[in-house]
Amino acid sequence: MSLFDFFKKKKSAQKAKDRLSVAIALDRDSNIYPHLDQMKQEIMEVVKKYSQIKDVNITKDKVGDQDILDIEIVLEEGR
């Protein structure tokens, strides 16, 4: 085994560790907000009662130790 192979293994191990960290973070988010898709659907239904909408986008961000839920509602033109 050459010196380059030794470092290559660490590189792939680091990539695997990073992928696992991302997978765990996504799993934690789904556990924190398990009903996010249902909430999006209900928000669309309520807004549709009063106006015509194209789309609703819901994103979750984290700033420091605070979770931010951002809701963007795209309305149809002419209303």
Curated annotation (Swiss-Prot):
Gene3D superfamilies: Cell division topological specificity factor MinE. Keywords: Cell cycle, Cell division. Coiled coil: none annotated. It comes from the Bacteria. One of its GO terms (biological process) is cell division. InterPro entries: MinE, MinE_sf. It holds the Pfam family MinE. Prevents the cell division inhibition by proteins MinC and MinD at internal division sites while permitting inhibition at polar sites. This ensures cell division at the proper site by restricting the formation of a division septum at the midpoint of the long axis of the cell. Belongs to the MinE family. This is Cell division topological specificity factor. It comes from Nitratiruptor sp. (strain SB155-2). The gene is minE.
